[in-house]
Amino acid sequence: SNLPVLNIGSGRIGYLVNSLNDIDFNKILKDKNVDNIKKRTPIIQNQDENLPAFNEIVIIKNSPTRILDIEIEVYDQNVKLRADGIIISTSLGSTAYNYSAGGPIVQTSLESIIITPISPFTKFPRSIVVDSSSELKINIPKKQHYSIQFDGVEEYLSDTKSDEKFNYKLSSVSYT
């Protein structure tokens, strides 16, 4: 459905959050034109499963004493990374975990994907910003213990006993 979203901060930090004093609820309820509201849904695909996230997808290690080996392919370039994890953010989500991990704040009107490592051990750019239509492939070699979180909710936990290599593909961010 085409329902507008009203952001109201409930914590101490809130980006794009209005003060309740600044909100004209009558205008919002009367306004039928919601063209300026965009839906951002990056999708991560694992085999036949599609899992959406509004702000970010985080792949993070589950053991404090281990490091993850992550292989990333974007624009036909392969990068191997050793880090505590990786954040894949939308431009709107760039002000959340991405920013806390040292990533850039990206203007929300830019249709982009931000790739930010979490405590990288290898030499890797702090962040990479790519066009939202870019295909991003992530490979996590077998027998590593990690979880995947979508907007802070854990959706997947790896099985360290499996000999399977986990391959993920991030489809383009949808802006409608």
Features from the language model and the residues they span:
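A generic structural signal for short beta-strands and their flanking turns/coil linkers
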Residues: 38-42, 53-55, 66-70, 84-86, ...
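Gly/Ser/Thr-rich active-site loops/lids in small-molecule metabolic enzymes
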Residues: 80-84, 88-124
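A residue-level signal for conserved active-site and pocket-lining positions in enzyme catalytic cores
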Residues: 9, 57, 152, 168
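Catalytic core of DAGKc-family lipid kinases
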Residues: 11-85
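Conserved small/polar residues in nucleotide/adenosyl-binding loops
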Residues: 176
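A conserved acidic, glycine/proline-rich C-terminal tail/linker
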Residues: 135-160
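N-terminal glycine-/serine-/threonine-rich phosphate-binding loop
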Residues: 1
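Proline-centered loop/turn at the N-terminus of a beta-strand
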Residues: 4-6
